From Swiss-Prot:
Gene Ontology biological process terms from the UniProt entry: DNA recombination; DNA repair
Source lineage: Bacteria, Pseudomonadati, Pseudomonadota, Gammaproteobacteria, Oceanospirillales
Designated gene of the protein: recR
Name under which the protein is recorded: Recombination protein RecR
TM ranges: none
Recorded coiled-coil stretches: none
GO molecular function: DNA binding; zinc ion binding
Length: 201
């Protein structure tokens, strides 16, 4: 007995599997739910995806997603031009903005260095970042790439560029999450936490 329903449903399931964290079973449930119960919402979803693909582009300054030449953060006169935070994705910008602890500007790499995957500096906009650093009044560069092998390699690569331009570089701290228990923390995270310790006030 075939596990397929129709070619159109199979195609929908394949496309839904492109979403992060969505496997075959979840994609199948989502597809069938859209077709069984929420056809109106499914049509709205299709329109919203098409609309986003048409209207959303990259900010000409920071590479974040926007619908104009500049994103709202780059347009804002209230942001501190002296501080630039480098992140891997627009999701990281949203996460930092939700803390309300940062008032500087951003540069979104849209990825990280990964030679094994053929992703080099030019693929993530490092040349554009260097030009921005040369032309702006940045006095601190914050590296907020992910604490992965690729994220660390990307941070080191960008740090060398900034240091050549005499721009001070800092790295966001990595360590134990608030409410976490030491016995449940992996050794790599615990090592970062110990190395990044600071005086207790």
């Amino acid at each position: 007995m075939s596990s397929s329903l129709t070619p159109a449903i199979d195609q929908l399931v394949r496309c839904l599997r492109y979403l992060p964290g969505v496997g075959a079973k979840t994609a199948t449930r989502m597809a069938l739910n859209l077709l069984e119960r929420d056809q109106g919402r499914a049509a709205d979803l299709a329109i919203a995806i098409s609309d986003a693909l048409t209207r959303v582009k990259r900010c000409s300054r920071c590479q974040n997603f926007c619908e104009a030449e500049l994103c709202s953060i780059c347009e804002s006169p209230k942001r501190d031009d002296r501080v630039l935070c480098v992140v891997e994705s627009p999701t990281d910008v949203l996460a930092i903005e939700q803390t309300s602890d940062y008032s500087g500007r951003y540069f979104v790499l849209m990825g990280h260095l990964s030679p094994i995957d053929g992703i080099g500096p030019e693929d993530i906009g490092v040349d554009k970042l260097k030009q921005l650093l040369q032309e702006s009044a940045v006095s601190e560069l914050i590296l907020a790439t992910n604490p992965t092998v690729e994220g660390e390699a990307t941070a080191h690569f960008i740090a060398h560029i900034a240091k050549d331009l005499n721009i001070p570089v800092s790295r966001i701290a990595h360590g134990i999450p608030l409410g976490g228990e030491l016995g449940m923390i992996d050794s790599g995270t615990l090592s970062h936490a110990l190395q990044g310790r600071k005086p207790f006030a």
